[in-house]
Amino acid sequence: MGVMEILVSTLEAVPGYRVAQVLGVVKGSTVRSKHLGKDLLAGLRTLVGGELPEYTEMLQEAREVAEARMLEEARRLGAHAVLGVRYATASVMQGAAEILVYGTAVRLEPAREV
């Protein structure tokens, strides 16, 4: 038996479906920091400007972990979708960031045409 696929959307509704049951807010978070050597390299890059790939990669990985944690919570509730998804980022300390992702877990059913 495969893992149930859960729709993740920033929308508040899914075209062709209606929300049959609101299961509540689900969230996932992680705090990440970079390796000291990579942090020093990124620090040097700030002197000349441009993208800091070390931090871009760190934040992308953190978003993926946070979203997976949110989806695990939604899966435990039996959700079909997580709607109104939002991401938040906060600096916790020098070189470390928290990523939080949250939304509303719902069960869906096909919309009835009138």
Swiss-Prot record:
It comes from the Bacteria. Belongs to the UPF0145 family. Gene3D superfamilies: Hypothetical protein apc22750. Chain B (3.30.110.70). This is UPF0145 protein TTHA1944. InterPro entries: UPF0145_dom_sf, UPF0145_YbjQ-like.
